[in-house]
Amino acid sequence: MYALVDCNNFFVSCERAFQPELEGRPVVVLSNNDGCVVARSNESKAMGIKMGTPFFKVRYLVEQGRLVVRSSNYTLYGDLSARVMSLLAEAAPRLEVYSIDEAYMDMDGVAPERIPGICSALVTRIRRWTGIPVSIGIADTKTLAKVANHFAKKYKGYRGVCVIDSEEKILKALALTPIKEVWGIGRRGAPKLESVGVKTALDFIKRPCEWVRGMMGIGGVRTWSELQGRRMVEDERDEKRKSICTSRSFDKMVTDIDEMTLRVSDFAGKCAEKLRSDGTASYSVGVFIQTNRFRDDLPQYFPNASVRLDVPANSTQEVVAAALRALRMVFRNGFEYKRAGVTVSDIVEADAIQTTLFDFDQEARDRDDRISKVMDLVNTSGKNLLRLATQRPGHYSDGIRREFCSRLYSTSWSDLLEIK
């Protein structure tokens, strides 16, 4: 069986773990640059605040003292996520980390009657050791585990753990699950199904397989089968990323090539680090730059370009150099740029790289690889302690507005809580 562990309102829960005075109060967490709402407490949901709501629309609630707001603190969230995942890894034979706040525990080999007890103990242990509340859904397939998790989270009577382990439970749960809430269907596919009378997950599985294939394609058939208890979604732990993107919106418009070079070099360097961390390399490096689409009073420009490498690369020097070549292809003066990003794609295993017959740069490439490894080692002690000249120093402001950011309670000596 699968047990899906989902941290409840994760970003908000991280803030509350070190600020207990926020318990019971409406809280939202904002995106980069304090742009819009990306996480909500149950209390703020009850106020009608939607995901993606621009901050300026709810700022008056903050000023009236009716809402607490926090800027995104990804260092804190990442550290608490790692702590939660380490506890799960101790309890599960196999663990697949799905996102920063979700993970599947593959419980095959564990006696079915023991699984609910193990999961109930985990809910208590994680809350006690990290301060993070979690919900766990248990079922034979990943999609049904998602359904079970929804019930565990929504209904307090489950005490954080819901098990769907019989046909009777499956049918009852699916009848209560709107089609738009089904993993693999979502809000894009739901209107199409609702228009032909498929309102719930139970309505969906009652349709013939060929009908589902015609409406939703092979992906829909997988979901249809999973909802009936047949495993179709495989373990994705060993799958490598097909592409990696690092991008950011700027708090101030960028207008000159020198400043944009610093930004793009940073993004490309981060992509290279992720490639090396995954043990992969990339054939293609792309860059996009964008003006502010919401500023009708300014000229608009949304170009992108990519550079194809003869030999796949993951060294910071090569990836940054390719990204800057792409940047020079698209950058134009006279525009005010709000956002930029770097994407590496056509990714292969690093140890499977084959050089070309006339590759005369292999010696330089080997040197770059050695330098990148040294950079990775040194930079474990601090951000950008060792960097390229085109990258920004570690103390340089990243240009992100964080007006309401909390402290780095778990990763910085100077931000540790004091007990008096």
Model-found features: residue ranges?
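Short, hydrophobic beta-strand segments
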Residues: 103-109, 304-310, 354-359
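C-terminal hydrophobic structural anchor segments
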Residues: 324-381, 386-387
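Gly/Gly-Pro- and Ser/Thr-rich, intrinsically disordered tail segments characteristic of DNA damage-repair
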Residues: 1-225, 235, 362-420
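Short Gly/Ser/Thr- and Asp/Glu-enriched loop/turn motifs at secondary-structure junctions
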Residues: 98-102, 139-142, 280-284, 335-339
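Short, internal active-site loops enriched in acidic
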Residues: 109-110, 141-145, 290-295, 344-350
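DNA-contacting surface of Y-family translesion DNA polymerases
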Residues: 181, 189-336, 352
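Short, well-ordered strand-loop elements centered on a beta-strand within folded domains, enriched
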Residues: 36-38, 160-162, 298-303, 352-355
